[in-house]
Amino acid sequence: MTKALEGVRILDFTHVQSGPTCTQLLAWFGADVIKVERPGVGDITRGQLQDIPNVDSLYFTMLNHNKRSITLDTKNPKGKEVLTELIKKCDVLVENFGPGVLDRMGFPWEKIQAINPKMIVASIKGFGPGPYEDCKVYENVAQCTGGAASTTGFRDGLPLVTGAQIGDSGTGLHLALGIVTALYQRTHTGRGQRVTAAMQDGVLNLCRVKLRDQQRLDHGPLKEYSQFGEGVPFGDAVPRAGNDSGGGQPGRILKCKGWETDPNAYIYFITQAPVWEKICDVIGEPTWKTDPNYAKPAARLPRLNEIFGRIEQWTMTKTKFEAMDILNEFDIPCGPILSMKEIAEDESLRKTGTLVEVDHPTRGKYLSVGNPIKLSDSPADVTRSPLLGEHTDEILRQVLGFSDHQVAEIHDSGALDPPRKEAAE
């Protein structure tokens, strides 16, 4: 069975997380992703957060599946020649360098277009054009500047960043969609184009409900927020709302049986209006179904602390899974707080390919995420990440068509290997 992106070749100049997330997704869909790495060094994450000495870290392996690796010194004249040939043979160049790095390498957009007019150049930057476009950005910086941190946490506490990598991985996923869109448009125009995704923009896109609420504030308090029921006035900016639901339906994280010793013995519970009467029956408060203080959503808003306190009395008598089973029978929206250990041990996620076990030649077997997007006609097979420069000669011969003599000549030039240390006299 062919893959969705089979025949698409991607020149991958990305590193760390945002760019590799993008190119890995495209590789899972069948694109031939050629990861260009510095000789002797490679992607910096190969050596970051290592759990096993002298072995590629999980940080690297889990972001670079299904790719091929070529080492190339782009400052070397022969290296520049090889890069020029790669540009001719590839459909997309993806990079997440700092601003201006491609230009300083000697390959600005105009030159790339002259070499290959069909080439799509896709870039991730921290900020879009403006006063901050030259600033260095990492995951937590993106969360802070994109509106996530200011709206995450509790009202009386500090802004918080999330555990999910919405700045890095989130922007990488945005860029992947942009690349596929540009590839489709190219089938009509025959031309390549630039595709850009700024991390600030990506985070803001994921925080759109908070931008929604910012505008709603102009017309009155946000009644579904806990502070409304507590009588706390709103300021002029969207507040941090703890674990309140962002969809307009009141929700909270509640304790379950065992919470005293298990830091994840909790469940998220939403008091959705259509199932309110079922909620009343489950928790043993049938009179609330007709009591004017509780029967209607508007009447419940000032009493959310009391209501969730009563629901929590019930959830504390059940494990999070027992509570979920009972609530699901009545179509009451809820979800257990799952630890990473629980997720890693969930066999159902392995059966769907959401979690995959990968065998690596130097670190052995490890667990990774698989493709979160499932295509019925293009199943994603997750293969291991490449060793540094593992496919260098293969790419030179098979992709660029170089002869053995040419490959040897390129090696002799030093374009593919780390600089040789001079022997001490």
Curated annotation (Swiss-Prot):
The Enzyme Commission number assigned here is: 2.8.3.16
Gene Ontology molecular functions: formyl-CoA transferase activity
* SUPFAM superfamilies attached to this UniProt entry: CoA-transferase family III (CaiB/BaiF)
**Its pathway?**
Metabolic intermediate degradation; oxalate degradation; CO(2) and formate from oxalate: step 1/2
Q: What class of enzyme is it?
A: transferase
Annotated catalytic residues: D168 (nucleophile)
The alphabetical list of record keywords is:
Transferase
| Binding-site positions, substrate | G247, G248, Q249
Whether Methyltransferase counts among this entry's keywords is no
Query: What residues does CoA bind to?
Result: 17-18, 38, 72-75, 96-98, 104, 136-139
Q: Which biological process, per GO, is one annotated for this protein?
A: oxalate catabolic process
Q: Which reaction does it catalyse?
A: formyl-CoA + oxalate = oxalyl-CoA + formate
Q: Answer yes or no on keyword Transferase.
A: yes
How is the subunit organization of this protein annotated in UniProt? Answer: Homodimer.
Q: Which family does it belong to?
A: Belongs to the CoA-transferase III family. Frc subfamily.
Record-linked PANTHER family: SUCCINATE--HYDROXYMETHYLGLUTARATE COA-TRANSFERASE
For this entry, the protein name equals: Formyl-CoA:oxalate CoA-transferase
What gene makes this protein?
frc
